[in-house]
Swiss-Prot record:
Subunit structure, as described in the record: Tetramer of two alpha and two beta subunits.
Family note: Belongs to the phenylalanyl-tRNA synthetase beta subunit family. Type 2 subfamily.
Organism this protein belongs to: Methanothrix thermoacetophila (strain DSM 6194 / JCM 14653 / NBRC 101360 / PT)
Gene this protein is translated from: pheT
A Gene Ontology biological process term: phenylalanyl-tRNA aminoacylation
Localization terms from the record: Cytoplasm
GO molecular function list: ATP binding; magnesium ion binding; phenylalanine-tRNA ligase activity; RNA binding
Descriptive protein name: Phenylalanine--tRNA ligase beta subunit
InterPro entries documented for this protein: aa-tRNA-synth_II/BPL/LPL, B3/B4_tRNA-bd, DNA-bd_dom_put_sf, Phe-tRNA-ligase_IIc_bsu, Phe-tRNA-synth_IIc_bsu_arc_euk, Phe-tRNA_synthase-like_B3/B4, Phe_tRNA_ligase_beta2_arc, PheRS_beta_core
Amino acid sequence: MPVVRLYYEDLEEMVGASRELIIERLPMMGADIGKSPEADYIDVEFFPDRPDLYSAEGVARALQGFLGIRPGLPEYQVHTGSVEMRVDESVKSVRPIIGCAVVRGLRFTDPFIESLMSLQEDLHWGLGRNRRKVAIGVHDISRVRPPFRYIAEDPDKRRFVPLDFDESMSMREILERHPKGVAYRHILDGFERFPLIVDADDNVLSFPPVINGELTRVREDTTDLFIDVTGTDPVVYRALNIVVTALAERGGRIEGVRMISPDKEWISPDLSPARWTVTTSEANSLIGFNLSAEELAECLRRMRFGARHLDNDSVEVLVPAYRADIMHTWDIIEDAAKSYGYENLKAEMPRTLTIGRPHPMEELKDEVRDLMVGLGYLEVMPFTLTNEKVHFEMMRRSAGECTRVMHPISELHTIIRTAVLPGLMEILSLNQHHALPQRLFAVGDVVIDGRTKCHLSAVSIHSGAGFAEISSLVSAIMRELRISAEVVESSDGAFIPGRGADLMLNGARIGCFGEIHPEVISAFGLEHPVVGMELELSL
């Protein structure tokens, strides 16, 4: 989980409260504090679901409300600016989503610079899936000339000096020689053109999601910033809102950027709050309190929501634009509970006494995990939600019946998986920068014909991966689990014909294994042979 370093003097100045009070109240907001009596700072750990608390500015803002110093909705004005960002059609197939902002009038201190850099990297991890979904660029705007352009170009066409280097390089050279290029080049695998942000004089600001240009490096005397956030998911806009509002907490003046794409124009950022309605009956039932509508509204104002009671049972809630975690009324109610204080909940003895024991399926899962670790495999946890392209098309499998998400918030998560193997292939594709061999396994739920089942899946990738290896693995698993299944040739498109097998038990297919088809390997951007298996455990 992200660890935020908070310097006492800096935090006291931003919050307007004493060090002792801050340390006392922080844990009640859900923070885990690690401190040294002799240090001039504390390290605070928050759950990953609150990316707005990944910075000293965000923590100070939340504390001001929690302590009653500045309750209610923070107001951030987006002033009219003169900067334009022109989004070229060429980026649509590479990294199509971008949001921008200008923040002026900043005065950097060492704690401020450290906080901004930490926030940027933590958002890359927490919201950005290590820059795949979101990458953030922060630039000294005084060194470039708008309007800016967001384009995709041949990686050998243009040269510029990347951050922390003193020589000009092409994008391809950066991916081969720059430490950041080596670390993130896998994100651009398979693309013929790479994204760039350039100014009116063709100076390069950024090569997202890899590296900024040295030209726009933020220095101690920098006062005006240009922020770009690019990615493949609308969470880009949430990340932008978190960054610009954190800068505004340091006294920055936010200016909008006119975004011009081939099909629309808009002003970025959009900091308008979302509007929700919460009922006291639902809140009191959920958390065991007995709050009136006005008391509930007051609790929410201390959590930096805008809140007013509409009637005896309803509260209108304005959710600030930097709160990327609010997806349900229960998220708002949880904040009300924190504000009221869990310590104010009265303890009640349970009316019944029961003695728990592990579910047989959980015991089987633990047995399987121990077995796979003993066989030299590393456990991973692919997402249960996936999409048709990864699950069927890239696996060379026909799209069968599956459970679909009714209102997906991302095109990456539209169905519930019916198999675990595609998720393992996806994880292999994300880990090509690690050494081979890689042997991974996962134990998890799938949904088939409306029923939840548990599957084991495993993959192995290296230059010598072959049928004998995966066949030996399956034999060991079957022997240890005392399963007697018939092995027959498989017609599964995920495997090479003649090198794939199905496991049959009482006439039903309970698993499969074999050498992954080269087309599947290529679809996931892999370059070495892969073998895989899948077995139903809920027999």
